Amino acid sequence: MPPKHNFMRKHISFFVFSCLFAQLVAAQSPAVVAIRDYSNKNAGTIINEFTGFLAIPNIAADTAGLQKTAAFIMDMMNKRGIKKVQLLNAVTPGVPPAVYGEVMVPGAKQTLIFYAHYDGQPVNPAQWAKELTPFIPKLFSQALDKGGMNISFPADGKYNNDWRIYARSASDDKAGVAAILNAYDALTKSGLTPGCNIKFFFEGEEEAGSPHLGEILQKHSALLQSDQWIMCDGPVHQSGKKQIAFGVRG
């Protein structure tokens, strides 16, 4: 089944806050309301940016596509006022770089790094439904396996929770990149201040097994000092509910 993105209103912003700003958000219902209101009011803008992101080819064999994808992410970060936005290259030449940025909060005692990856799996057209094209995002009334029909993106920016976007990496893992950055956007534009320093790290080789991730981490170890990493990638629970995994074996 091709990747799909679920338009649950809390998905793009709230699940990240439940990890990153637990001491801020969970204890203050007005903050939760403000974040949800922001996501609802700005859904059209958020999805327009996301579909533009999905339209950029990001498979490992397409070097130019990966470069454009990384540049798009840097633009997303710069527009949100994130500092020190840059590419982190490996020692090995020609390797897809990680995209980095940071927000340092005066007085913060902890630093968290949020991880997602911007590369996608190879595309096999034979495995895609006939009405789908990997890098042309399409909106459906519900999941295809539930009889979803292709519908137009709404001009009024109002989205139903049952709707789905289908495209390569709509879930794994451009959704992770977009969710993290829109969560930060919702936080700041709702007048809320993070309780910790935030660093952003978006990898470009995860689907290839991250063969040069160690090089990047070692080369840029000073910049990547932190207390914890939060990985915004992983399988969807069979219930469809959002989940936080605190560790895995191996």
Give a label for each model feature:
Residues 156-248:
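Acidic/histidine-rich catalytic neighborhood of metal-dependent amide-processing enzymes
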Residues 1-30:
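Bacterial Sec-dependent N-terminal signal peptides
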Residues 4-6, 245-250:
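Short, intrinsically disordered, charge-balanced linker/junction segments flanking boundaries
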Residues 22-23, 68-70, 130, 216, ...:
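Residues in and immediately flanking transmembrane alpha helices
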Residues 20, 107, 130, 193, ...:
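A generic structural signal for short, non-catalytic loop/turn and secondary-structure boundary residues
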Residues 26, 135-138, 177, 184:
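Ubiquitous "structural anchor" signal
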Residues 28-168, 189-194:
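Acidic/His- and Gly-rich active-site-bordering loop/insert found
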